[in-house]
UniProtKB/Swiss-Prot annotation:
HAMAP family: TrhO. The active site is at 185 (cysteine persulfide intermediate). PANTHER family: THIOSULFATE SULFURTRANSFERASE/RHODANESE-LIKE DOMAIN-CONTAINING PROTEIN 2 (PTHR43268), THIOSULFATE SULFURTRANSFERASE_RHODANESE-LIKE DOMAIN-CONTAINING PROTEIN 2 (PTHR43268:SF6). The keyword tRNA processing applies. The keyword tRNA processing applies. One of its GO terms (molecular function) is oxidoreductase activity, acting on paired donors, with incorporation or reduction of molecular oxygen. Catalyzes oxygen-dependent 5-hydroxyuridine (ho5U) modification at position 34 in tRNAs. It catalyses: uridine(34) in tRNA + AH2 + O2 = 5-hydroxyuridine(34) in tRNA + A + H2O. Belongs to the TrhO family. It comes from the Bacteria. PROSITE patterns: RHODANESE_3. This is tRNA uridine(34) hydroxylase.
Amino acid sequence: MAVPKIVLFYVFTPLADPEAIRLWQYTLAEAHDLTGRILVSEHGINATVGGDIRDVKRYVKGTRSYAPFKDADIKWSDGLGNDFPRLSVKVRPEIVTFGAPGELKVDADGVVGGGTHLAPEEVHRLVEGRGDDVVFFDGRNGFEAEIGRFRDAVVPDVSTTRDFVHELDSGKYDHLKDKAVVTYCTGGVRCEVLSSLMRSRGFGEVYQLDGGIVRYGEAFGDTGLWEGSLYVFDKRMTIEFSDQAKTLGRCTRCGGPTSRYENLPDDRGRELVLVCAGCTENRAG
């Protein structure tokens, strides 16, 4: 019986021949019937793929056989089967698109000048010791935070990661430059870049949640500082860490609580919108 699984991982490391890595990764993933998205650049690799657990394990083993990727932090989650429409493996200037490839520096140890990594338990100790001096800073697209975020987090007004550079340069967050800023995102890759951009712009004490929201949820579920659901970029669209998850989102039709996204146009021209099950049923009827 097939057991669908999804893995998420990234590695920042210099890659002299991204095209060779792309061909190898495509061949490896295709050989094991995986689907998903893999981005490769001179700065490293960023991948989310899914398939049967046995095939995914073989892919992970093969990927880790390449020395620069041997310590990749692989984040596992349950899939639905056919979670991605196809396999896409591409070379891009950036493995996460901030529109600032020239600002990012990496070496064999990862991003140069990024924020200090904190495990979920270390984040709790920081908050317990520093209180209101600690600020959570959301490193995701704005719509993702509509259904889940850290308590009292700063959520920048961004539609894509390309908007972050302008947001940081606007000065609207300069009052945080003397705070302890904890950046967070889904699996950690966006905060690797975001934290380095913040540090280069004068934010003095910048951290990043190691392993992202995924690792935090594994450690604390819904008993810690995270509230709501987590948006994911596959067929599932959202996941919860327990049945105690709060519902933060609001239906764009009736205003009722929901964490349910649908691909529908709305009056703002956005296709991905929050729509509760009741409104979907009423529309269908």
